[in-house]
Structure formats: structure tokens, C-alpha cells
Amino acid sequence: GTNVQVDSASAECTQTMSGALMLIESLKKEKVEMIFGYPGGAVLPIYDKLYNSGLVHILPRHEQGAIHAAEGYARVSGKPGVVIATSGPGATNLVTGLADAMIDSLPLVVFTGQVATSVIGSDAFQEADILGITMPVTKHSYQVRQPEDLPRIIKEAFHIATTGRPGPVLIDIPKDVATIEGEFSYDHEMNLPGYQPTTEPNYLQIRKLVEAVSSAKKPVILAGAGVLHGKASEELKNYAEQQQIPVAHTLLGLGGFPADHPLFLGMAGMHGTYTANMALHECDLLISIGARFDDRVTGNLKHFARNAKIAHIDIDPAEIGKIMKTQIPVVGDSKIVLQELIKQDGKQSDSSEWKKQLAEWKEEYPLWYVDNEEEGFKPQKLIEYIHQFTKGEAIVATDVGQHQMWSAQFYPFQKADKWVTSGGLGTMGFGLPAAIGAQLAEKDATVVAVVGDGGFQMTLQELDVIRELNLPVKVVILNNACLGMVRQWQEIFYEERYSESKFASQPDFVKLSEAYGIKGIRISSEAEAKEKLEEALTSREPVVIDVRVASEEKVFPMVAPGKGLHEMVGVKP
Amino acid sequence: MKRIITLTVVNRSGVLNRITGLFTKRHYNIESITVGHTETAGVSRITFVVHVEGENDVEQLTKQLNKQIDVLKVTDITNQSIVQRELALIKVVSAPSTRTEINGIIEPFRASVVDVSRDSIVVQVTGESNKIEALIELLKPYGIKEIARTGTTAFARGTQQKASSNKTISIV
């Protein structure tokens, strides 16, 4: 091909180039900092143009690692994560990450290779109907039929992924489309008549909300990830302070409101604080901001906020009324809505009794664990040490399960975008690659991947990326030699029949790290933690810390499935 | 409850797949779908007849459909004054001896015979679904060999009457 190497700044007029080069030029136009990808047959033309393109490409050791890293990058930077994988197995390895990003509303633009258009549908080598496979887990998807369409599609994809409720957009590129030449232009107007997200709230609903607050006796805010996606944590704080409304967070919202703030009630839900859960149970006005009433937050809906008027602020109209009957629906961007509410400066509610009650609960029912080393080194204590040694300023990435809940409980976040966790999908193996993406987004930050020994083994091959790029990621394995949360449920709900939740064997994680050229240390007691943990967490090199924790420890408090939030157990030692 | 929902969509590949996938994902039952071009090039109209549990489901379904990038407009027209039509082809066992009798049956339905063979005829009928069902019932005793139905397509009438109760069952 006679490719014109175009300076991205000067490519205003149309140029003839191959589809692959159009892709590169489009990514430059979108000011993409880095790509997480893995080459293969169908994307060879793209990788050939990537070579010497000046774009930074991160090569994980598995496509799943690429997409989770892109998610971590997106969560921390607020920018879209860009992923490339080849056709067939390369593409299908992305499915978990797409589903994860979809349910947790993370902006991704994902490129998959496809077999040549002439053989699509013939069960060709490495052919998979990736559009069909991923439709339910993408915000939108495209298959490019001719190179001329690529710039338009890429422009639309970045727009769709990052606006409204963010989400993953997939672009499937047949191999020949990458090779054929066409006219490149990136100046065209976006034409998406069916996509116009509402960001400005309806003034009438704002007035209704202001009035509802002024007449409430027991108001509470439930703040979710929408506050973070909208970059609205400052506004949330100002609004809560102006109106003196207490705030509870969902798991994914953590960091949106400072944990040490007197109005903060903690995390709500299955393993939330007593105060947050009772506040949601007893309130007379529930203002949900960018949260979607997940079953892990609400418990049994029959009991949830049973006496409350519900105000629901969300950029996605489909979330309003999906789970809860809503009296005050406010469709809009969290930041704009909160700014509008602050501007209204409505009358505060008369809720001194309510706040007194909440303060009493906070005092009476703090998060707890029994610090008894005879049962082993308590994982909660480990998280407290991590918090202490990182001065509460680290970015923490986790998988799903007990270690995730303990991190949420015992690592209080003061600031937004420090918490990278797989909430909706609950993906094991998310934490390590997500931490890599987070570290690449925030080069100077302390990034700690808190993982279980189960999840770690699902994506541990990405240690090689940590080594290769010398990323100072700290991998802390809460090693209880079992699938802790599965074990906990089997103990409580399945009469201690520990079906396949205990690993009969386990690799030596220290030696394993060393095999990857990464320092590995083992901590088996509190004394060892005191001795070794601070140095490990404050160094500027990668470390894997295998911490042997009490294996029978359970996460409390707990709302059993089917129960209401007020029926939580384990609220006190 | 049965609802008739019409959509206008940008006619791009995969749009129907996305929409029907959404029904599966959210657990809604589709009774019928019709798809066809509209007066605008590149825009198609889809008419769904769906069964849902209640109002809340309709609202949720409408909102989820609206979220699709290629969906331009979603309307639940069930309670509007609408024109709804379905076409059915019914192959009925018919010896020459019963042919006149069948003709007598289909005539009030303004159905027509569009194919005749030695032992069967094909009846074409258009109208609302319940009219078609009524005709099928009447033809059953003769023996039905095959039925092909298009599913309902519909849109709102030019003039909307006030009450939804005065909807007449038109046989035309």
C-alpha cells in the first residue's frame, strides 16, 4: 500500500490510506494515550501500522488482562480505555471484561479483528460472531464494512462510550477492511439522532426535590458510582453540607464522599455498616444519586426504605423506576443536578432527632472484628495496616469476595477515583490487571492490588507486565487457601459442606513472584506485618506480598439473601 | 397484558438483533414482530406485540429500547386509536364439493382465495388478529394444512379519539 504518513495535526483534508492506518490516525485524533492489546492473525495489518506509530501499546499476557487493565485505567483516569484483540479466541477472551465494564459503566472502546469479509459466515479459521456474542454486554457495537466508514465509526464510538451513562463500545474490523485503502477524514459532524443523553435536569423535579428535603424529617443520600463518573464528589460534599443530609455509599461509590466526614454513614448493603443500612431502612426521604438499587445494596425490596419517598437522580432514565417506585425522578448528569440543587439553596430539613439517632448508631455499632491472633492473622487488621502504611492515599484495586468487602470496610477513602473494584459483575481476576491499568494512569500513585488467592490465580500471568514495565504495583494476596466468600456461605447456608471451596494444593506465591523477577515476601503474623509491610508498601518497586490470614474469618455485618437490611446479623462482636 | 409497541430505527445491520436480544435479556415475551421500510430512506419501522406483567414492565421495556443507539423513537400505541393489520395465508383442505361452502364462509371476512389445487385452496385474509383467528376457527372443520401469519403491524390513526373505550372492532 502507498500509505501517506500523516501528521495528525495536519490531517484536516482527506487523505487516502489503509483502514489500519485510519485506525491509528483516528486514535491520535482522539488523543489516546495508550492501548491495551494483544496481536493475532486478523489484526496483523493493524499491528503493522501500530509499529512506529508513536502510540503506546501495553501487551498483557492474556486478552482478559488487557481489558481489565483498560477498565482500571478508565476508572482512575476518567478517560476511555482502548483495547485491541484479534478475531475468534482473542475476541471471546474479552467477553468477561465487556460484561464487567457494561454493568459498572466504564467507558471502553474495544477493537476486535475479524476474518475477511469474503469469508465471514463460513466458519473460517479464528472466526467468531463477536457482535452477536457481545451484544448484550456492549453499549453499542459496529462491524466495519468498508474503510471509509472507520473514522466516522471510531468518532461515534468514543462519543458513545464516554457520554451519557458510560459503557463499552465494540468495533469489529474484518482483516481486508484494514488493508483496503479509502479516503480518510475526521472532520465530519456526528450524526446520532437516536442518541441524545439528557444531562440537564427537569426544573419541576428539582423543585419537588427541594420541597421534599425541606419537609423531610429523616433524609438520607445514597451515592453510587454515578457521582464518580460525573466527577461530582465536590458537589456532593457541598450539597450534603449545605442541606445537612447524611450520606451512605454503595460499594462502587466509595471515595465519592470523604470517609471521615461527620455526615458519612459508611457503605450500605449486604456487608455495609449498621448505621448506613438502618438509615436506608428508617429514612423518610431517600435521595439516590447515580446508584441503581442493586440487590446487594437493597436486600429484600419488600422492606427497603419502606416509609420513604424516593428521589432518584440518574443519567440513565431506564434505571429510574426499574427497581424502586420513584416519586421524584430526576434524569440528568450528577454534577449538573447537584450544582442546580446547591443553587436552589432550599430550606434544610428539620432532622436533628434523626441525626442524633444516626450518631448513636454510629457510636454503638462500628465495624468490628475480633483481634485474636490465636485464630490467625486477621485480614481486617491487615487492611488496616495497609491503610496506615499507605496513609490512606493509595489506589486500591480488588477482585470480588471477602478481601473486597474487608477492603471496602477497613480502607476508608477520602478521595474519589482511588477505588477500583468489580462491583456489578463480581469478577475474580479483575484486581491485578486493573491495578496495572490504574498504575499506568497514575504513574506516581501507590497502587495496591488486594486480591484473594483464588482470584489471583485467574490472572496472575500479568505479573510479567508489572515486571516488564517495572510498575511499582503492590500485590497483596489475602491467602486463606480457600474461596473465602464461597466458604462463608457454605458455612452459614449449606451446613458447612465445603464443596470445592478449599484448594488442596497451592503454589508457593513467593517463589512464583521470584520466577517472574518480582520481589516476593511472606507475612504470616501481625509481628511480621509490622516488620515487613511498611517497607514493602512504600518502596517504588513491584512486590508480591503473600499474607497468610485466618482462613475461617467471616465478613460481618451481613444481610442474608432474602432478608431486609434491618435484619442484618453480626452487628456486634 | 398485551401491548403493541412501535419503533422507528436506523436501518443498520445488527439493529434487529440488538432489539430482540434485549427482549431475551430482560425476559419479555414477543408474540409477533413485523419490520419494514418507512417513508424515510434508511429508517425502518418495527411493530412488536408483546406480553408483559404490568405497567412497570412496559415502562422499563420502552426505556430500554430507547437506550439503543439506533432506535429513534419508541411508542406504546396500545391505548391509542390505531390501525392494526395482519395478513394470514391459510391452506385449507378443499375438495371441489366444499369449495363453494368455503367461499361462503370467507366472503364476509373479505378474504380471498389466492391459490387453488386439486385438494386444497389458499385463503388470504387481512385484518386485526382476532378477525383472523375467527376465520381460522371457522375453517378448522375443513382441515387446515398450513398457516402463515405476518404478525401485527400498526400505527396511530391520523385523528385520535378521546376515550380509548370507543374503539370499534372493524372487520374491514
Curated annotation (Swiss-Prot), chain B:
> What keyword terms does UniProt attach to this protein?
Amino-acid biosynthesis, Branched-chain amino acid biosynthesis, Transferase
By its UniProt entry, which SUPFAM superfamilies does this protein fall under?
ACT-like (SSF55021)
| EC number(s) on file | 2.2.1.6
The reply on keyword Hydrolase is no
Supply the source organism for this entry: Bacillus subtilis (strain 168)
Q: Which GO terms describe its cellular component?
A: cytosol
Question: What is this protein's name?
Answer: Acetolactate synthase small subunit
Q: In which pathway does it act?
A: Amino-acid biosynthesis; L-isoleucine biosynthesis; L-isoleucine from 2-oxobutanoate: step 1/4; Amino-acid biosynthesis; L-valine biosynthesis; L-valine from pyruvate: step 1/4
* Keyword Transferase attached: yes
Its ancestry begins with: Bacteria, Bacillati, Bacillota, Bacilli, Bacillales
Q: Which residues belong to any copy of the ACT domain?
A: 4-79
Q: Which GO terms describe its biological process?
A: isoleucine biosynthetic process; L-valine biosynthetic process
Catalysis: reaction(s): 2 pyruvate + H(+) = (2S)-2-acetolactate + CO2
PROSITE patterns under this entry? ACT
